[in-house]
């Protein structure tokens, strides 16, 4: 499932913009480089978010295939407010286009 979504996103966004790997999930916003570095060092997490873990747990319990698709809105380097405003529309448009393409392929 994740391969299908990755291929669709790659087709929309082009080379070098799609990454597959572990996404950490938790109950806090990761905004500093130190916390970001700790998550990578301990778990090799490529990104962090706050919603996917609970959905993944329920999907796994019910045997439902699941993939997290994330557009990275900030780099966890203290510039989150600026980054979000800059990338919100682009991220939403690109994610929607990739999802439409992936669903057609399923």
Residue locations for each model-derived region?
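Glycine-rich phosphate- or other oxyanion-binding loops that anchor nucleotides, phosphorylated ligands
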Residues: 1-106
């Amino acid at each position: 499932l994740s391969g299908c979504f990755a291929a669709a996103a790659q087709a929309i966004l082009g080379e070098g913009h799609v990454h597959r790997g572990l996404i950490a999930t938790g109950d806090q916003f990761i905004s500093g480089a130190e916390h970001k570095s700790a998550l990578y060092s301990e778990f090799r997490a490529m990104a962090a978010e706050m919603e996917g873990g609970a959905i993944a747990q329920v999907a796994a319990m019910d045997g439902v295939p699941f993939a997290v698709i994330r557009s990275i809105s900030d780099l966890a380097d203290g510039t989150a407010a600026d980054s979000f405003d800059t990338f919100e529309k682009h991220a939403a448009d690109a994610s929607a286009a990739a999802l439409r393409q992936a669903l057609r392929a399923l």
